[in-house]
Amino acid sequence: ECLGKTSDGKTIYLWQRNGQEEAPLLRELGRLREIAFRAVEEGSGKRRDTDSYDDDYLHLILWDDDDLEIVGAYRFMPTAMQVEKCGVEGLYSYSLFHYDEKMQDILEHGIELGRSFIQPRYWGRRGLDYLWSGIGAYLARYPHYRYLFGPVSISGGLPPAARDLLVAFYRLWFPASHPLAASRQPYPASLPDVLAQFGGVDYVDDLTKLKSLLGNLGCGIPPLYKQYSELC
Protein backbone atom coordinates (compact mmCIF):
# COMPACT_ATOMS: atom_id res chain seq x y z
CA GLU A 1 0.00 0.00 0.00
CA CYS A 2 1.38 3.39 -1.00
CA LEU A 3 0.95 6.12 1.62
CA GLY A 4 2.44 8.92 -0.44
CA LYS A 5 5.49 10.46 -2.07
CA THR A 6 8.05 12.93 -0.77
CA SER A 7 9.01 16.21 -2.42
CA ASP A 8 12.27 14.67 -3.68
CA GLY A 9 10.62 11.65 -5.26
CA LYS A 10 10.87 8.96 -2.59
CA THR A 11 7.87 6.73 -1.94
CA ILE A 12 6.40 5.71 1.41
CA TYR A 13 4.91 2.21 1.48
CA LEU A 14 3.07 0.16 4.08
CA TRP A 15 3.82 -3.56 4.05
CA GLN A 16 2.90 -6.61 6.12
CA ARG A 17 4.12 -10.16 5.73
CA ASN A 18 0.65 -11.73 6.09
CA GLY A 19 1.89 -15.29 6.50
CA GLN A 20 3.98 -15.43 3.32
CA GLU A 21 6.38 -18.38 3.44
CA GLU A 22 9.00 -16.46 1.49
CA ALA A 23 9.49 -12.82 2.42
CA PRO A 24 12.59 -11.42 0.66
CA LEU A 25 11.50 -7.91 1.61
CA LEU A 26 11.62 -8.81 5.31
CA ARG A 27 15.07 -10.35 4.87
CA GLU A 28 16.28 -7.11 3.27
CA LEU A 29 14.73 -5.04 6.05
CA GLY A 30 16.52 -7.21 8.59
CA ARG A 31 19.84 -6.88 6.76
CA LEU A 32 19.62 -3.09 6.56
CA ARG A 33 18.38 -2.81 10.13
CA GLU A 34 21.41 -4.75 11.32
CA ILE A 35 23.77 -2.52 9.30
CA ALA A 36 22.19 0.64 10.73
CA PHE A 37 22.20 -0.65 14.31
CA ARG A 38 25.80 -1.87 14.08
CA ALA A 39 26.83 1.63 12.99
CA VAL A 40 25.75 2.88 16.44
CA GLU A 41 26.95 -0.27 18.26
CA GLU A 42 23.46 -1.70 18.75
CA GLY A 43 23.69 -4.62 16.33
CA SER A 44 22.39 -8.07 17.17
CA GLY A 45 25.52 -9.78 15.86
CA LYS A 46 23.41 -11.73 13.38
CA ARG A 47 23.36 -11.41 9.59
CA ARG A 48 19.88 -9.92 9.86
CA ASP A 49 18.13 -8.20 12.73
CA THR A 50 14.69 -9.82 12.68
CA ASP A 51 12.45 -11.35 15.30
CA SER A 52 9.07 -13.06 15.59
CA TYR A 53 7.25 -9.73 15.89
CA ASP A 54 8.29 -8.83 12.34
CA ASP A 55 5.93 -11.51 11.03
CA ASP A 56 2.81 -9.80 12.41
CA TYR A 57 3.73 -6.14 12.55
CA LEU A 58 3.27 -3.51 9.85
CA HIS A 59 6.38 -2.04 8.26
CA LEU A 60 6.48 1.55 7.05
CA ILE A 61 9.12 1.64 4.30
CA LEU A 62 10.77 4.63 2.64
CA TRP A 63 11.84 3.70 -0.90
CA ASP A 64 14.31 5.55 -3.13
CA ASP A 65 13.06 5.15 -6.71
CA ASP A 66 16.29 6.50 -8.21
CA ASP A 67 18.71 4.26 -6.32
CA LEU A 68 16.26 1.33 -6.04
CA GLU A 69 17.11 1.18 -2.34
CA ILE A 70 15.23 1.02 0.95
CA VAL A 71 16.15 4.24 2.75
CA GLY A 72 14.76 3.17 6.11
CA ALA A 73 11.75 1.77 7.89
CA TYR A 74 9.60 1.95 11.00
CA ARG A 75 7.90 -1.06 12.52
CA PHE A 76 4.51 -0.43 14.06
CA MET A 77 1.28 -2.12 15.07
CA PRO A 78 -2.23 -1.06 16.05
CA THR A 79 -2.13 -2.73 19.44
CA ALA A 80 -5.79 -3.72 19.68
CA MET A 81 -5.39 -5.85 16.56
CA GLN A 82 -2.35 -7.66 17.94
CA VAL A 83 -3.82 -8.15 21.43
CA GLU A 84 -6.97 -9.65 19.92
CA LYS A 85 -4.87 -12.05 17.86
CA CYS A 86 -2.06 -12.98 20.28
CA GLY A 87 -2.86 -11.44 23.66
CA VAL A 88 -0.76 -8.73 25.28
CA GLU A 89 2.23 -11.09 25.03
CA GLY A 90 2.15 -10.49 21.28
CA LEU A 91 3.35 -6.91 21.73
CA TYR A 92 7.08 -6.23 21.47
CA SER A 93 6.92 -3.54 24.16
CA TYR A 94 5.39 -6.04 26.60
CA SER A 95 8.64 -8.02 26.46
CA LEU A 96 10.37 -4.92 27.88
CA PHE A 97 7.73 -3.45 30.20
CA HIS A 98 5.10 -4.50 32.72
CA TYR A 99 1.80 -2.79 31.92
CA ASP A 100 -0.47 -1.19 34.50
CA GLU A 101 -4.16 -2.08 34.15
CA LYS A 102 -4.79 1.58 33.25
CA MET A 103 -2.84 0.94 30.03
CA GLN A 104 -5.95 -0.72 28.61
CA ASP A 105 -7.36 2.45 27.01
CA ILE A 106 -4.07 3.13 25.24
CA LEU A 107 -3.89 -0.45 23.99
CA GLU A 108 -7.41 -0.15 22.60
CA HIS A 109 -6.76 3.13 20.78
CA GLY A 110 -3.01 3.13 20.27
CA ILE A 111 -0.21 2.21 17.92
CA GLU A 112 3.10 0.79 19.10
CA LEU A 113 6.16 2.14 17.26
CA GLY A 114 9.69 0.81 17.27
CA ARG A 115 12.73 -0.68 15.51
CA SER A 116 13.14 2.36 13.27
CA PHE A 117 16.28 2.75 11.19
CA ILE A 118 17.78 4.76 8.36
CA GLN A 119 20.58 3.01 6.50
CA PRO A 120 23.85 4.92 7.05
CA ARG A 121 24.30 6.12 3.47
CA TYR A 122 21.11 8.18 3.88
CA TRP A 123 21.89 9.70 7.26
CA GLY A 124 21.37 13.45 7.41
CA ARG A 125 18.98 13.45 4.45
CA ARG A 126 15.55 13.80 6.10
CA GLY A 127 14.82 10.07 6.06
CA LEU A 128 13.45 10.05 9.60
CA ASP A 129 11.26 13.08 8.86
CA TYR A 130 9.81 11.29 5.84
CA LEU A 131 9.00 8.21 7.92
CA TRP A 132 7.14 10.43 10.36
CA SER A 133 5.23 11.86 7.41
CA GLY A 134 4.22 8.31 6.58
CA ILE A 135 2.99 7.73 10.12
CA GLY A 136 1.00 10.96 9.81
CA ALA A 137 -0.52 9.75 6.54
CA TYR A 138 -1.55 6.49 8.21
CA LEU A 139 -3.17 8.37 11.11
CA ALA A 140 -5.03 10.59 8.63
CA ARG A 141 -6.54 7.46 7.09
CA TYR A 142 -7.35 5.91 10.47
CA PRO A 143 -8.10 8.85 12.79
CA HIS A 144 -9.58 6.69 15.56
CA TYR A 145 -6.05 5.94 16.79
CA ARG A 146 -5.30 8.42 19.57
CA TYR A 147 -1.99 7.29 21.04
CA LEU A 148 1.52 6.55 19.80
CA PHE A 149 3.90 4.76 22.14
CA GLY A 150 6.86 2.43 22.16
CA PRO A 151 10.37 1.78 23.45
CA VAL A 152 13.42 3.83 22.47
CA SER A 153 16.96 2.70 23.26
CA ILE A 154 20.22 4.34 24.24
CA SER A 155 23.22 2.96 22.37
CA GLY A 156 25.53 0.76 24.40
CA GLY A 157 28.32 2.40 22.43
CA LEU A 158 27.87 5.66 24.34
CA PRO A 159 30.18 6.22 27.32
CA PRO A 160 28.51 5.29 30.64
CA ALA A 161 28.74 8.93 31.73
CA ALA A 162 26.79 9.99 28.63
CA ARG A 163 24.09 7.39 29.27
CA ASP A 164 23.79 8.59 32.87
CA LEU A 165 23.39 12.19 31.71
CA LEU A 166 20.71 11.30 29.17
CA VAL A 167 18.72 9.25 31.67
CA ALA A 168 18.98 11.94 34.36
CA PHE A 169 17.89 14.71 31.98
CA TYR A 170 14.89 12.88 30.53
CA ARG A 171 13.77 11.61 33.91
CA LEU A 172 13.89 15.19 35.18
CA TRP A 173 12.06 16.86 32.30
CA PHE A 174 9.80 14.08 31.00
CA PRO A 175 8.71 12.12 34.07
CA ALA A 176 5.69 9.82 33.97
CA SER A 177 3.04 11.72 35.93
CA HIS A 178 0.81 8.63 35.86
CA PRO A 179 3.11 5.64 35.18
CA LEU A 180 1.40 3.10 32.95
CA ALA A 181 4.41 0.85 32.37
CA ALA A 182 7.43 -0.25 34.39
CA SER A 183 10.66 -1.49 32.86
CA ARG A 184 11.47 -5.15 33.36
CA GLN A 185 15.13 -4.13 33.67
CA PRO A 186 15.08 -0.55 35.05
CA TYR A 187 18.07 1.73 34.67
CA PRO A 188 19.72 2.48 38.04
CA ALA A 189 18.59 5.59 39.88
CA SER A 190 20.41 8.74 38.81
CA LEU A 191 23.26 9.71 41.14
CA PRO A 192 23.03 13.07 42.94
CA ASP A 193 26.16 14.42 41.25
CA VAL A 194 24.65 13.69 37.83
CA LEU A 195 21.31 15.28 38.71
CA ALA A 196 23.17 18.30 40.07
CA GLN A 197 24.28 19.11 36.51
CA PHE A 198 20.75 20.33 35.77
CA GLY A 199 18.87 23.13 37.47
CA GLY A 200 15.39 21.77 36.79
CA VAL A 201 14.01 25.32 36.34
CA ASP A 202 14.55 26.23 32.68
CA TYR A 203 14.26 23.49 30.05
CA VAL A 204 16.27 25.32 27.39
CA ASP A 205 19.10 26.02 29.83
CA ASP A 206 19.25 22.39 30.91
CA LEU A 207 19.07 21.17 27.30
CA THR A 208 21.97 23.45 26.40
CA LYS A 209 23.91 22.09 29.37
CA LEU A 210 23.17 18.51 28.31
CA LYS A 211 24.42 19.16 24.77
CA SER A 212 27.59 20.74 26.13
CA LEU A 213 28.29 17.89 28.55
CA LEU A 214 27.67 15.27 25.87
CA GLY A 215 29.86 17.20 23.44
CA ASN A 216 32.70 17.04 25.95
CA LEU A 217 32.28 13.26 25.87
CA GLY A 218 32.38 13.18 22.07
CA CYS A 219 28.70 12.41 21.49
CA GLY A 220 25.29 14.02 21.20
CA ILE A 221 21.62 13.50 21.89
CA PRO A 222 20.29 10.49 19.92
CA PRO A 223 18.05 11.64 17.01
CA LEU A 224 14.93 9.85 18.23
CA TYR A 225 15.24 11.46 21.65
CA LYS A 226 15.33 14.84 19.95
CA GLN A 227 12.25 14.10 17.85
CA TYR A 228 10.17 12.56 20.63
CA SER A 229 10.93 15.35 23.09
CA GLU A 230 10.08 17.98 20.45
CA LEU A 231 6.71 16.28 20.00
CA CYS A 232 6.13 16.52 23.74
Tell me the role of every PLM-derived stretch.
Residues D66, M77, F117:
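Anionic group-transfer/hydrolysis microenvironments
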Residues G4-H59, W63-G72:
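Short amphipathic alpha-helix that is part of the acyltransferase structural core
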Residues E1-K10, A196-V201:
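Short, compositionally biased low-complexity segments
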Residues P24, E34, S44-R47, A80-C232:
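Acyl-donor binding region in acyl/amide transferases
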Residues Y74-A80:
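Short beta->alpha transition motifs characteristic of CBS
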